[in-house]
C-alpha cells in the first residue's frame, strides 16, 4: 500500500502535466467545435435544401460513428493520401470535427426555441437578419444552450483519453506510459480516473455557478 502511494506521489508531476494538456486539448477542441458548429447550425436552418442536406449529412456521419474511428482515419488513414499529421494536430482536428456535430444540434435547437415574433419585431424596426441574430437571438439562445454545451465540454474532457491511442501525451497516455514501466496497472489508472473525476466535478460546479448567475439576471434584470 505504501509503495503504491509513493508511486502516485512520484508520478504526480507527469499525471498533472497530462491533466493540463487534457484541459488545453479540450478547450481547443470545444472552441473550434463551437465555431464550426454554429456554421453548421445556420446551414441546418437554411431554406436551401442542398445546404441543409450537407449539414445534416455531416452531423449524421460524425454523430453516428465512433470518435476513435475518426481519430484513426485522420492520423493513420490520411497518410495513404499523402497527408501526414503529428499526433496533437490530428487529435485537435478529430475532436473539433466531432464536437461540431453535437454543438450544431444544440445551437440549432437553442436558436429555434426563441420566439419567432422577435424576428418580425426586429425587422419592423429596420434590423437586418444578421443584426437580429447577433443582438437579439444569440444572447437568448446562449442561455438556452449553456447547460447542454457545458455537459458536452465535460464529456469532451473525458473523451480526450481516446487521443492516447494516437500517442497524444494527455492524462490517460501518461498513465499508460507509467504503467508500462512500473506494471502498477490498477494504481495508475485509479489515479488517472480520480484526476478526471476532480476535473469533471470542478467543471460541473462552474457550470452550476454560471447557470445560477444567469437565472438571477433573468429574475432581476437590474
What are these regions (language model features)?
Residues 1-222:
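Transmembrane alpha-helices and adjacent helix-loop boundaries
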